[in-house]
UniProtKB/Swiss-Prot annotation:
Name of the protein in its database record: Elongation factor 2
Main location: cytoplasm
Catalytic activity: GTP + H2O = GDP + phosphate + H(+)
Organism of this sequence: Cryptosporidium parvum
Binding-site list for GTP: 26-33, 152-155, 207-209
Keywords noted in UniProt: Cytoplasm, Elongation factor, GTP-binding, Hydrolase, Nucleotide-binding, Phosphoprotein, Protein biosynthesis
């Protein structure tokens, strides 16, 4: 146990090589928060007794009740360790960020990852790698974050499932292999090989609930002394196909009669024997073992029996805190090392300006550059700490800084505030400590700048500094709810509350429809539910009436327009000719993932479009814009030749395109995956007759006409559902999915367990209350996990009278208070 003073912490903060910024990531319920307790307990912020039950990082009342982590919290830990590099024992400061595993909160995970350099990936030994593990690990690797693995809940394998040592070994190898497959798929050459290997010490095994864990390195240290070999040699032997023959006392690569796998014999068997002797109450046997292991029980602990005794003994022998902190300190990078290869991903500006150099060297004397990844609510309602990480320079109380929002461009005035920082604070889970200043490489909370930032942003002192790239979220908000106050007089309170809500959660989108409705969009039912609850109790503190959840749709086309569409301007002097066609498969997703974007070099982009998607080279060079919001998955291509004055109307056409793609023709939803071709333009010679007022509405009309003639269709969002359940309830799962238009595309039994893993696609529109219904159908044995996966075409032509799709379109139009009928083509198409 260590009791800190702020001065001591501040002293280590100045040594970037002794800092580790890391987060704990895992699938929901794989025991992340419980494990974090062992770490916090070791670093001396909770009293030792509470570990395993305290769930220290779950700071909100609803997290404690629901037993899930919703917001990610940061805690600083202190640990002394000898890295065996000749410098002796050194103090380390570990900034730990516990992040949620539930998929609806994966925006929180993204925010947590941006400010860390390493990740502890937790996987349940019995359940293995699940969908959320994969999603989060993929996000981590995209951010160039180095992983280490902890295989958790080994106590289940020993006590519930009573596995033998060899079964456990086979199971461990399978889990590690699955993790490494994901790592090698998504990793980056610049980081080198980041796969995890037990024999290199980057994998630990243990139980968060019982508070014990071990790495191969830990046992290798013990046996290396005993056998008189080097530790590194011993580590190689204790894993993989190395067998020990007790008669000849030799290690072999192949299994001979009488020899056993070294991992099983030297590591798993002693643990299994200790478990069984304690659980069977064989006192003579386990007391002798404890003497050999050097574990001494003191005072009250001597009277313990059964599980409490087991927990105590394992904690004393293989303390989880020590093992994990050792692994973190030894195998995760310090900011000084990590920022060298992360700077390209993080910094938007040129890689050789003073800020980029400061980040690369993690230099406390360079100009300040800090990224605020999220807003943390303070104890007084409605104010927030800006939580983030200093990448370069030093941030101090009272310092005058430039607060740059995500839309800031160097040299511009938009989204820029110059203000003083009132206080800098250390975030300690439930507590906050004041600190005078914080140098590069550390995480920090700032007071007094929350009103100038919406969700995230960059804080600098250099006038030339660019932004740190804003975060890419892996989930898109597809579930929306309209909210209104129960008493209309309280509308202003609701509006204020919505502003605070959108600050506190990186992924919520709060908007106001033209009808005056206030909409909250989230990425799943649970997410929206928590947001509404926050809004009602915390931010607005009024009674709220929420509508049923509404699903966002997208509009697209499936053919090339069957005619060239023409629209004339209101003064009849200008004509625009256009067609629409679908974008090639895969390009839409590439645009959404940012692989093809308006910021790319036009030459490189046109080569990619030509080689991969068969675009015409000339057309690919003449893409005018992407939309909606200038980055969306629709493009406008200029295929005209030799038109006078064309450049003058380009901006007007672009704004018409943004407008048209934001509110599609069928039911004013966003368009997706459409390519508009501008074929020909006839313009009036006088500039005064071809201004924005003439061109913009005309261009929008011709786009609507082009979309209507190209077989318009609706797209609906689909969830990927992953369900693990026992074999006997599979029938109930299929029945529930079939009632809701879901279809199963993958089912496999999990080896070594009675569980079956099922993956299915389920339309978001039919996913509400799915969890509740599924639990009822399977008597609570099936656990679904939904994550937005893709947009699926709805079969059926919305223009066909009486079709189901037409009904759907009408329903959406009714909800939006616009005329029910889809406007006729004649409204948009003009004759010559």
């Amino acid at each position: 146990m260590v009791n800190f003073t702020v001065e001591q912490i501040r002293e280590i903060m100045g040594k970037p090589h002794n800092i580790r910024n890391m987060s704990v990531i895992a699938h929901v319920d794989h025991g992340k928060s419980t494990l974090t307790d062992s770490l916090v307990c070791k670093a001396g912020i909770i009293a030792s007794k509470a570990a395993g039950d305290a769930r220290f990082t779950d700071t909100r009342a609803d997290e404690q009740e629901r037993c899930i982590t919703i917001k990610s919290t940061g805690i600083s830990l202190f640990f002394e360790h000898d890295l065996e590099d000749g410098k002796g024992r050194q103090p380390f400061l570990i900034n730990l960020i516990d992040s949620p595993g539930h998929v609806d909160f994966s925006s929180e995970v993204t925010a947590a990852l941006r400010v860390t350099d390493g990740a502890l990936v937790v996987v349940d030994a019995v359940d293995g790698v699940c969908i959320q593990t994969e999603t989060v690990l993929r996000q981590a690797l995209n951010e160039r974050i180095r992983p280490v693995l902890h295989v958790n809940k080994v106590d289940r394998a020993l006590l519930e499932l009573q596995w033998e040592a060899e079964d456990i070994y086979q199971n461990f190898t399978r889990v590690i292999e699955n993790v490494n497959v994901i790592i090698s798929t998504y990793s980056d050459e610049l980081m080198g090989d980041v796969q995890v290997f037990p024999e290199k010490g980057t994998v630990s095994f243990g139980s968060g609930l019982h508070g014990w864990a071990f790495t191969i390195e830990k046992f290798a240290r013990i046996y290396a002394k005993k056998f008189g070999v080097e530790k590194s040699k011993m580590m190689q032997r204790l894993w993989g196909d190395n067998f020990f023959n007790p008669e000849t006392k030799k290690f072999t690569k192949t299994q001979e009669p009488g020899s056993k796998r070294a991992f099983c014999q030297f590591i798993m068997e002693p643990i299994c024997q200790l478990f069984s002797s304690i659980m069977n109450g064989d006192k003579a046997k386990y007391e002798k073992m404890l003497v050999n292991l050097g574990v001494e029980l003191k005072g009250d602990d001597k009277a313990l029996v059964d599980k409490p005794l087991l927990k105590k003994v394992m904690q004393l022998w293989l303390s989880a805190g020590d093992t994990l902190l050792e692994m973190i300190v030894t195998h995760l990078p310090s900011p000084a090392a990590a920022q060298k290869y992360r700077v390209e991903n993080l910094y938007e500006g040129p890689q050789d300006d003073e800020t980029a150099k400061g980040i690369r060297n993690c230099d406390p004397d360079a100009p300040l550059c800090m990224f605020v990844s999220k807003m943390v609510p303070t104890s007084d309602k409605g104010r927030f700490y800006a939580f983030g990480r200093v990448f370069s320079g030093t941030v101090a109380t009272g310092q005058k800084v430039r607060i740059q929002g995500p839309r800031y461009v160097p040299g511009g005035k938009e989204d820029l505030n110059i203000k003083n920082i009132q206080r800098t604070v250390l975030m300690m889970g439930r507590y906050v400590e004041q600190i005078p200043d914080v140098p590069a490489g550390n995480t920090v909370g700032l007071v007094g700048i929350d009103q100038y930032l919406l969700k995230s942003g960059t804080i600098t002192t250099s006038e030339t500094a660019h932004n740190i790239a804003s975060m890419k979220y892996s989930v898109s908000p597809v579930v929306r709810v309209a909210v209104r106050p129960k008493d209309n007089k309280e509308l202003p309170k609701l509006v204020e509350g919505l502003k605070k809500l959108s600050k506190s959660d990186p992924l919520v989108v709060c908007s106001k429809e033209e009808t005056g409705e206030h909409i909250i969009a989230g990425c799943g039912e649970l997410h929206v539910e928590i947001c509404l609850q926050d809004l009602q109790q915390e931010y607005a503190q009024i009674e709220i009436v929420a509508s049923d959840p509404i699903v966002s749709y997208r509009e697209t086309v499936v053919n090339l327009s069957n005619q060239t569409c023409l629209s004339k301007s209101p003064n009849k002097h200008n004509r625009l000719y256009m067609t629409a066609e679908p974008l090639p498969d895969g390009l839409t997703d590439d645009i959404e993932e940012g692989k093809v974007s308006p910021r790319d070099d036009p030459k490189e982009r046109s080569n990619l479009l030509h080689d991969k998607y068969g675009f015409d080279k000339n057309a690919a060079m003449k893409i005018w814009c992407f939309g909606p919001e200038t980055t969306g998955p629709n493009i406008m291509v200029d295929v005209t030749t030799g038109i006078q004055y064309l450049t003058e109307i380009k901006d007007h056409c672009n704004s018409a395109f943004q407008w048209a793609t934001k509110e599609g023709i069928l039911c004013e939803e966003d368009m997706r995956g459409i390519r508009f071709n501008l074929l020909d333009v006839t313009l009036h010679a006088d500039a005064i007759h071809r201004g924005a007022g003439q061109i913009t509405p005309t261009c929008r009309r011709v786009m609507y006409a082009a979309a209507l003639t190209a077989s318009p269709r609706l797209l609906e969002p689909m969830f990927l559902v992953e369900i693990s359940a026992p074999q006997e309830v599979v029938g109930g799962i299929y029945a529930t999915l079939n009632q809701r238009r879901g279809h199963v595309f993958h089912e496999e039994p999990k080896s070594g367990t009675p569980q079956v893993e099922i993956k299915a696609y389920l339309p978001v529109a039919d996913s509400f209350k799915f969890t509740t219904v599924l639990r009822a159908a399977t008597s609570g044995k099936a656990f679904p996990q939904c994550v937005f996966d893709h947009w699926e075409l709805i079969n059926g032509d919305p223009l066909e009278k009486g079709s189901k799709t037409e009904e759907l379109v009408k329903a959406i139009r009714r909800r939006k208070n616009i005329k029910e009928e889809i406007p006729a083509l004649d409204n948009y198409l003009d004759k010559l």
